[in-house]
């Protein structure tokens, strides 16, 4: 410490000697402005090097995240993984790296200093300075009113500029989840420009890193990819806005110290970003084999000007850790999602019949009433009227016209929506209706009246997707309009219980008539924030209405939207074979309670595939069960089967919605056999789903070792959705130990064979 102080005083002495030798008054003033911040920074570094490191412990029941910092020094990231009861020794941690190769692992690295990795924060300050070096100020932790939740705030400031950053960590003890975001505050005299503003930087050290993430397309969402990370960078990102999760999803699994994926064993970190706009997850492995994960809003074309006194809050990043493989990480996320991440995550959405694939745009009151009658006769609990019910000057008889004109179509429904909703209620069904309030057809009264509300750049054409344009949610007037669409739809009847909110295009060739010309790059952030402002207003007025997030299927499957929505429409592809992979991938990060899954007609309208009614039901029952077909086209045998399957589903629905998920194999396995089971929290009941996804012949006999059961408890197995079981174990009782270690071998010799088995503790 004494040596550091000696060096500091020598530096100050030499500086003032320089002033005496070279100092004209005006030059002296300029040099002081340059040197005094340098002296302050030097002093901070010298003092912090001598001061003891403080340990910042952010822990749950089984997981710890540990930072260290000294006053005026940098904030270091020391650990994320299994819980450490006493992390104090990490105050003395040394990385043994040469300083000229880069800094230690920083909690929130910025452009500046010795950080050579991609920064979490990149800023141009008001005076043009492009460097930022964050220094520790203080930290504090407090338990929230929910005693399960602890919040820790770490305050930092730039060593030379009036720019502050707060890192906010929220620990959920029982769920073993830690979330984090950053708050950036401008105290400078002029505006600063944020070029990169990630939510989180997570440095990790392991021998190997296996990245698991989701990719896909429309009607082929949530396909699973495994990549062994090597030196360099890999990014998962979306630049599409609105429908951000078709091609990539803002979530990942990292298996540490292994190049193989396992459901049951190994150290796994899971992350998911709660953001409905463009996102970016960057994975960078450096020369020390340190992996740094950056996660947050995508900085691409999104420079954000922060005026003096303004703050910018990044989206929330969600992390968990497990030593029990991918399955353990998924269950942690599912528990957190039901308790905190999904709007009313413990509320069950009713089984339903959706009109879309059964009627499309061609319906009237008679058609809808018949569908309602059929839904009631099969035991369904809700009827949802999809697209096509609105527009008069430009009637919504196809996708070319009417979108934006939210008046009830008098030709189709002369007695209005209340007439249909009341009829559904009279049959014992709830009623839901479809809207797409963020969009507009060129052929609409809204487009004629408010061309300035349409997202388009000046002097360029506004391209259409699905024959529609995007409304500019950066504009408060458009936010008012979108809220009004929801509000006025609810006023059509006091018997509307459910809203399906759709969004059928991305954003491209963007431009805003509302934003100033020099702030057009705010569009990508402000659109998502405008969407959230609308949803906040909706939930304040309609806290109990069920709302589904649909965006051409699974285009909004992420935790930013789920804060306001009860469920998502997992995919527009309702074909059961395709759904095996779609629902499997989705389940890695999102629980069954949020997954809409429908039984549709065969041949399927998306793929043309022909599958038996039992296979379609058994697949759909692994999520929130619904139907999407014309019931009058079903055979009597299919109707009878549907009644039985729906009744069975209600018997075990709570286990699927609220239980622990155990995946047994994957739909990618060469065997073509795949299973999953849900186990109640008290382990007294479980439901097992098994599927044959390709022809097995007589040579491949699958065995399923069950998971999550109490080894000392006996479980009686009952096969559902069959007249007579062909399985030798049906109706018999086995210990959880036997079922886990020896397993069972359901008979599934043919493609599209499937089984649903209810296990009950004796």
Residue ranges and their predicted role:
Residues 51-58, 63-66, 73-284, 300, ...:
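Polysaccharide-binding surfaces and accessory modules of carbohydrate-active proteins
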Residues 62, 182, 309, 424, ...:
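Conserved, mostly hydrophobic/aromatic
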Residues 62, 252-253, 263, 667-711:
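Carbohydrate-binding surface patches
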Residues 112-134, 265-277, 319-342, 380-387, ...:
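Glycine-rich, aromatic-flanked loop segments that form ligand/cofactor-binding clefts
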Residues 129-134, 304-323, 752-759:
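Short Pro-Gly-centered flexible turn/kink motifs
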Residues 344-484, 493, 498:
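Aromatic-lined carbohydrate-binding/catalytic grooves of carbohydrate-active enzymes
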Residues 414-416, 448-450, 454-612, 624, ...:
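Active-site neighborhood of glycoside hydrolase catalytic domains
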Residues 694-762:
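C-terminal beta-sandwich/jelly-roll accessory domains of carbohydrate-active enzymes
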């Amino acid at each position: 410490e004494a040596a550091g102080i000696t060096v500091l005083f020598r530096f100050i002495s030499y500086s003032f000697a320089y002033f005496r030798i070279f100092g004209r008054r005006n030059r002296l003033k300029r040099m002081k402005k340059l040197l005094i911040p340098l002296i302050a920074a030097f002093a901070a570094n010298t003092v912090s090097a001598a001061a003891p490191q403080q340990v910042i412990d952010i822990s749950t029941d089984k997981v710890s995240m540990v930072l260290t910092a000294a006053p005026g020094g940098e904030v270091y990231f020391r650990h994320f993984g299994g819980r450490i009861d006493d992390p104090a020794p990490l105050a003395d941690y040394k990385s043994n790296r040469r300083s000229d190769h880069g800094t230690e692992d920083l909690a929130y690295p910025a452009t500046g200093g010795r950080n050579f990795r991609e920064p979490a924060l990149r800023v141009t300050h008001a005076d043009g300075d492009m460097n930022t070096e964050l220094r520790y100020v203080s930290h504090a932790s407090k338990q929230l009113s929910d005693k399960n939740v602890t919040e820790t705030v770490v305050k930092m400031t730039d060593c030379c500029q009036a720019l502050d950053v707060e890192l906010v960590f929220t620990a959920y003890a029982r769920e073993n989840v830690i979330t984090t975001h950053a708050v950036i505050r401008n105290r400078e005299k002029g505006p600063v420009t944020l070029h990169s503003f990630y939510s989180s930087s997570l440095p990790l050290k392991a021998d190997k890193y296996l990245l698991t993430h989701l990719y896909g397309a429309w009607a082929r969402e949530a396909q699973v990819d495994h990549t062994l990370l090597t030196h360099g960078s890999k990014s998962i990102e979306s630049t599409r806005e609105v429908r951000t999760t078709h091609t990539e999803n803002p979530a990942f699994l990292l298996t540490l110290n292994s190049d193989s994926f396992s459901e049951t064993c190994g150290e796994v970190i899971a992350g998911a970003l709660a953001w409905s706009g463009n996102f970016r997850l960057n994975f960078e492995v450096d020369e020390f084999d340190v992996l740094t994960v950056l996660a947050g809003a995508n900085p691409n074309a999104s420079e954000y000007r922060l005026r003096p006194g303004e703050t910018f809050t990044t989206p929330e990043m969600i992390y968990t850790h497990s030593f029990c493989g991918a399955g353990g990480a998924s269950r942690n996320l599912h528990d957190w999602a039901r308790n905190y991440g999904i709007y009313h995550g413990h509320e069950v959405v009713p089984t339903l019949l959706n009109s879309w694939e059964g009627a499309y745009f061609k319906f009237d009151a008679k058609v809808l009433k018949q569908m309602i009658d059929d839904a009631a006769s099969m035991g369904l609990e809700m009827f949802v009227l999809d697209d096509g019910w609105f527009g008069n000057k430009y009637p919504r008889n196809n996708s070319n016209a009417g979108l934006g004109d939210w008046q009830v179509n008098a030709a189709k429904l002369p007695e209005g929506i209340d007439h249909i909703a009341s009829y559904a209620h009279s049959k014992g069904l709830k009623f839901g209706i479809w809207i797409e309030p963020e969009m507009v057809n060129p052929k609409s009264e809204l487009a004629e009246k408010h061309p300035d509300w349409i997202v388009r750049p000046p002097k360029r054409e506004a391209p259409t997707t699905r024959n529609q344009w995007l409304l500019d949610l950066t504009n408060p007037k458009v936010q008012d309009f979108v809220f009004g669409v929801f509000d006025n739809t609810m006023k059509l009847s006091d018997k509307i219980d459910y809203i399906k909110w759709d969004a059928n295009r991305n954003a491209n060739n963007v431009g805003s008539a509302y934003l100033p010309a020099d702030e057009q790059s705010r569009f990508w952030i402000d659109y998502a924030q405008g969407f959230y402002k609308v949803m906040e207003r909706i939930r304040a007025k309609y806290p109990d209405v069920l709302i589904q997030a649909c965006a051409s299927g699974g285009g909004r499957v992420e935790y930013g939207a789920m804060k306001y929505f009860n469920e998502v429409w997992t995919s527009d592809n309702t074909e059961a074979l395709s759904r095996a992979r779609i629902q499997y991938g989705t389940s890695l990060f999102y629980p069954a309670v949020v997954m809409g899954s429908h039984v549709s007609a065969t041949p399927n309208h998306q793929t043309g595939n022909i599958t038996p009614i039992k296979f379609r039901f058994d697949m759909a029952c692994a999520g929130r069960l619904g139907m999407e077909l014309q019931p009058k086209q079903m055979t009597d045998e299919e109707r009878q089967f549907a009644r039985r399957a729906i009744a069975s589903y209600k018997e075990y629905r709570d286990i699927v919605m609220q239980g622990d998920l155990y995946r047994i194999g994957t739909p990618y396995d060469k065997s073509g056999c795949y299973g999953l089971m849900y186990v109640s929290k008290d382990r007294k009941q479980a439901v097992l789903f098994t599927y044959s996804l390709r022809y097995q012949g007589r040579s491949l006999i699958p065995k399923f070792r069950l998971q999550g059961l109490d080894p000392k408890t006996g479980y009686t197995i009952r096969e559902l959705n069959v007249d007579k079981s062909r399985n030798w174990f049906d109706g018999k009782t086995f210990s959880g130990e036997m079922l886990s270690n020896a397993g069972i071998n359901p008979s599934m010799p043919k493609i599209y064979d499937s089984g649903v088995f209810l296990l009950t503790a004796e």
